[in-house]
Structures are given as structure tokens and as C-alpha cells.
Amino acid sequence: MKVTNASLLALLLPAVSGRFVETGEPDRSILYPDGLPQPTETGEKYHIELSPGDTRWVTEDEKWELRRSGKRFFDITDHPDLGALRAMTASRKKSVFPEKPKYQKELKPFLAELSKTEMEDHLTTFTSFHTRYYKSDYGRQSSEWLLKQVRDTIEKAGADKHVRAEHFKHPWGQNSIIATIPGKTNATVVIGAHQDSINLWLPSVLAAPGADDDGSGTVTILEAFRVILQSEDIVKGNHENTLEFHWYSAEEGGLLGSQAIFSSYEKEGRDVKAMLQQDMTGFITRTLDAGKPESVGVIVDFVDPNLTQFIKVVIDEYCSIPYVETKCGYACSDHASASKAGYPSAFVIESAFEYSDNHIHSTEDLIKYLSFDHMLQHARMTLAFGYELAFTDFAALEKPDHSDSL
């Protein structure tokens, strides 16, 4: 049976005057004191890609129906040509990465500075927004709050003369955020997470705290960003490669924010050496309930195999839990936009995909289900990944006779 937003709203009217809060969770205030917003059904169509070459036109309601059924996709309406420049290029350099980590001594004091408290404090506020749906005013407000946290982090580190953070603007209201730590070259290493959340039943009305998806990834990379700025060499730009931390808008709508960014990078000819996505980093209950050891999930489909291998050796070196290989399908998070644009990308999630958080996209995606100890493991990996690749001499690695590369 097809269920429209209008019929759902009628069913839920008696409930929406209540509060979508749990005991012990942050107060999200009375919902819509000026009256319940009406969902709009304009009949506008969106062009989506469910797999390479498999495209169709759908309404917004149909987008959410697909998402509720577990389907992921690119919404290519605004960026139908993402990757076209790559396709026109006759040859492309093979991605190469260090065979093993080499900055253990330098990283040791910084790894000790990673803080569960910092992540929890940020996530508590971040989930207090009624929703972070990218078309909502709450989504705009949460993005502005997040940019302030990133800028405050830069200022507290005394790095504001060298490091900058800006909105990457979008027409739907919630902007993406890019923090840039310039290196000696314009070769760039990107670390990303998505800042938006969604309730797939009535995105513009129902609460979507999004603690795990992807509040957890958002604060994980923010904590890695905070600590990496404690490195004087990093702040002063003594590292080889520029580091960027991205917080994408509108991932839930079909990777919209990341597509806009990587489409821009592709057209500008930006040299992105690696992109790592952190989407959902805090839920381990189903893994443990299944009798499996706590681990991080390394995605192995639709990713760059050489970058993924490098991430495995980073986890082995810097994390105290193992990794498991797992798959998530086509267009399952923002790394897919980087990959489509021709850049080596990878994705690490909280567990094997089949044991990932089953509370997402609902009012129940709450902090109480998350493990900050587990998120700390993701932060360790993220910090080490960023630091190791910041100092990597890619020009030397890419020489045909170089032996210290994957």
C-alpha cells in the first residue's frame, strides 16, 4: 500500500502535539509551538541513480519509500555529470599509499588526548535539535551551531592564522562545512561525515535526533580535528598535504551535499589523494548480542582497494580492536560521491553492516544506545589516518620504482 505524507500526517496528528523525548535525553522543547507545518506535495520529480546506469525519476515521497525499503541512491538531479571528466580521461594514476604506518612516535601523545567527554558533550547538544533534516530550519540552525564549534576549536588551538572553516553553501538551507589545514602542497586528504539526520516517515515533522546517524561520525571527526590541531607542525603547515575535514549536508536526500562539493572539486581539477568517510561510529549492541567480538567495519565494496588496505594497517597499528570486512552497497554514504568524481575513497562503519544500528531514521536514534569507548576507537583511527597521510610524500610513492607503497 502506498502511504503518502498527507495520510501519515492525518494518522499522526493526535501524537504530534506531544513531545518526542526519552527520559534522560536532552529536552528538545515543545514541538512547533506556532502550529504544525503542513507537508508539501508539489509533484516535483527527482532523478536518482540506484546503481551504475540504473536511473529513474521519482517524487520526494517515492524517495523516502525507497529509503524505507533499504534502497540507497544518488539524487543526480543537480549533478548528472559527476564523474564525466574522469570518464573522458584516457588514463588515471593508480592510487598508492604507504605500506605501513611510520609516525607512531609522533602520534603517541596526541592519541592520549582524544576525549570521550568532548564527543559526548558535543553530541548531547547536536542531538537536542528537533531534527537536522536538510530542508528544515532546524537543519540550518544545527549547521550554524556546528560551524561555530569547528571555528571555536580552531581558535582554542591558536590556529586561526593558518586554519579556516567555512560553509559550502547549498540552496536547500543547511550548508556543508569544510575546515582546511593547508600543507606544503595542494594535494588534499579529506576526512568526512554527514551532519544531517532524517525521520523517514515524515521528515519535515517528526523528530530525528540522529545520535548515531550521523551525529556519532560528526563528533568523531570533530574530536580528531581538535587533537590534530595540537600538533605544531600541522598548524604551521609543515606537513606535505593539505588536510580537509568535511561535514556534509543532505546525505540522507541522496548524497546531495557531498555531490555538490566533489563536483566542484572535479571541475576545478583538485588533487584529492584520499577520502575517508565516518558514518555511524557508536553502536555495538547487536554485534555483542550476536556473540561477535567488538570491531570496526571496513567497507570493501565500491571503494578504493589500495586506500582500504592502508586503513586496515592503520587500524591494526593504532586501534585496540580488530576490523571486519563488510559491504554496504551502492551510494551508501558520502564517500561514494568522491569515488564517482574519480578520487580514492573509503568508508569505515561501527560494525559489520548486518549488525549496524537499527534505531536510525527514527525518534529512537538516541545517545543512550551508543558506546563512546567504541567511538574513541574510530577517533584513534581517524586521527592516525589524517596524520599519517598529511606527512606522506605522494610524489615519491607514485614513482614506478618506489617499494614502500601499497
From Swiss-Prot:
Can you tell me which family this protein belongs to?
Belongs to the peptidase M28 family. M28E subfamily.
Give its E.C. classification number: 3.4.11.-
Which keywords does this Swiss-Prot/TrEMBL entry list? Aminopeptidase, Disulfide bond, Glycoprotein, Hydrolase, Metal-binding, Protease, Secreted, Signal, Zinc, Zymogen
**Self-association and partners:** Monomer.
Residue ranges listed under propeptide: 19-94
EC class: hydrolase
Function, in words: Extracellular aminopeptidase that allows assimilation of proteinaceous substrates.
Disulfide feature: 328-332
Say which species the protein is native to.
Answer: Chaetomium globosum (strain ATCC 6205 / CBS 148.51 / DSM 1962 / NBRC 6347 / NRRL 1970) (Soil fungus)
Localization recorded for this chain is: Secreted
Please name the CDD domains in this protein's record: M28_AAP (cd03879)
Q: What is this protein called?
A: Leucine aminopeptidase 1
User: Which biological process annotations from GO are given for this protein?
Assistant: proteolysis
